[in-house]
Amino acid sequence: MNVAWPAPRTLVVAGLGLALVAAIAVGGWYWYDTEQRRVGAAYAEVMTRAYAAQAPQATSDTRTRVARELEELIARHPSGASAAEAAYELGNLRYAAQQYPAARGAYEIAVARGASPTVRTLARSSIGYTWEAERNFAKALDAFQAVAKDLGPKDFLYEQTLLDLARAQELAGRTADAVATYQRLLKDFPAARRADEIRGRLVTLGAPAPVPAPPTAPASAPVRR
């Protein structure tokens, strides 16, 4: 049986085509890697200025300029690996400037794009702070309640979130709920860093604070005869 082999030119053209595709793939990967490094470096540079801008000695002009840089960087590179962290820091700068709606918008970006649970939790709590600063206690309460539902006693920010929730409940006039939250906090954290403050709030609200359990005595060593 006669087999028709491809002409040598066809084989050469096909080989060149495969080589070209491979070269494009390698070049594309190299370009992507280079671009990601460039974007990462840009974020790192601006974020360094953002941290410095939040120092007490930083001027309002500095904070405004850095906030604008963060805003522009996020708009140019919204899918950058550090976009969520940058949005969170932008929110902090806007919050410090008492621009609460703008801060809330930045925090919402951090929540939407954050791969880190810590960044998302911080941003979600900060949304509650913006509502509280605007004296919209009902929305602040909703925000803190949503965060508290997703956290357990072993989670980062659990203690602070319950304190925020109880404070919002007080401000919203829901005294019984605030008492329950404070008591829950003391139950989960008998040795909480702010236990005295929490007990003080319970006394102010006319509720008894849970009595801390006495420390358990260490087991005595067996007597050898």
Where are these regions (language model features)?
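N-terminal positive-inside, membrane-proximal cytosolic segments immediately preceding the first
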Residues: 1-19
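Short solvent-exposed coil/turn linkers within tandem alpha-helical repeat scaffolds
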Residues: 74-83, 97, 111-120, 148-157, ...
